[in-house]
């Protein structure tokens, strides 16, 4: 008799995706982040669902409803902080997942990569709208500043901003629609994740060497299920330490003050995971130029496959490209730091230099370095 997991219409799909899936035998811990992102998404949807049961999307009660969740709801404080810090964990895994894709050349699976970029944009939009919901000072002013950027679009900008606001300022209508979108977008993200996996399983996983591994595959279960469970336990440990010992570490103190349209905070900034893009936005004096740079700082990932000039897929055997990759990583950390600093000297200059470095490394220096490595490899072969 055939095993039910191989014959049942539904179980067969799960079997081909998570049990009998042929997987390269040499994939490292950097390949764990896909499953961790799935776990983060489940945590966010479940905690978000319970928060939505007690939250009220109305300007006069939103702030107090969040306080009510933390004070009066059983384990409400735990659910709220798991959701807030779960978002931070989500973005840590997301950025490491993208970084692994860049390092090992996973972007050569263009369909999977492009769906991944779409997922990144959707998750960022969801997180931004979620940050507005507690209706604290930083929620209100963050929403005002970021949505106001759309007014830089020629001709239709102002009308578009007022359409998104549902009035002439961020108010009741804005909060209601942001809650509606924040609630519904995770389900769209889940659908996109399934499409992402569908395209990935068409080609099979990449591996650290970047070469074809069809001759050396092992089943996903039990080898990688055990490995993923270990990664999940480590991530949950880190998340629980953050939630139980310093839940407000990554938040902004201003958000514990109810939103006041008449009082502007001294320094408006988004959550830490958007600071690198915010620093790029602020480094350009022109409003439209800043908005375009902000969008392109993420959209640049879409043209990475076109800029791949190396004869090798992975950076594993390309020391110069490796150096550039880690310089880029350090540069992003500098941009994140600058995004959280006030707009004054020397932070403005550092931000501008880091922004120029970010784009020039990805667009110019990396492709040229790859060409140079091809030449060096050719010369080495000739010498031998």
Swiss-Prot record:
Query: How does it sit in the bilayer?
Result: Multi-pass membrane protein
Residue sites binding heme b b566 per the record: 97, 196
Gene Ontology CC: one annotated term? mitochondrial inner membrane
A single Gene Ontology biological process assigned to it is: mitochondrial electron transport, ubiquinol to cytochrome c
Q: List the transmembrane segments.
A: 33-53, 77-98, 113-133, 178-198, 226-246, 288-308, 320-340, 347-367
| InterPro entries to which the protein is assigned, alphabetical | Cyt_b/b6_C (IPR005798), Cyt_b/b6_C_sf (IPR036150), Cyt_b/b6_N (IPR005797), Cytb/b6-like_sf (IPR027387), Cytochrome_b (IPR030689), Cytochrome_b_C_euk/bac (IPR048260), Cytochrome_b_N_euk/bac (IPR048259), Di-haem_cyt_TM (IPR016174)
Residues binding a ubiquinone: 201
- Gene Ontology molecular function terms on file: metal ion binding; ubiquinol-cytochrome-c reductase activity
Q: Where in the cell is it found?
A: Mitochondrion inner membrane
Note on how the cofactor is bound? Binds 2 heme b groups non-covalently.
Q: Which cofactor does it need?
A: heme b
Put simply, this protein is called Cytochrome b
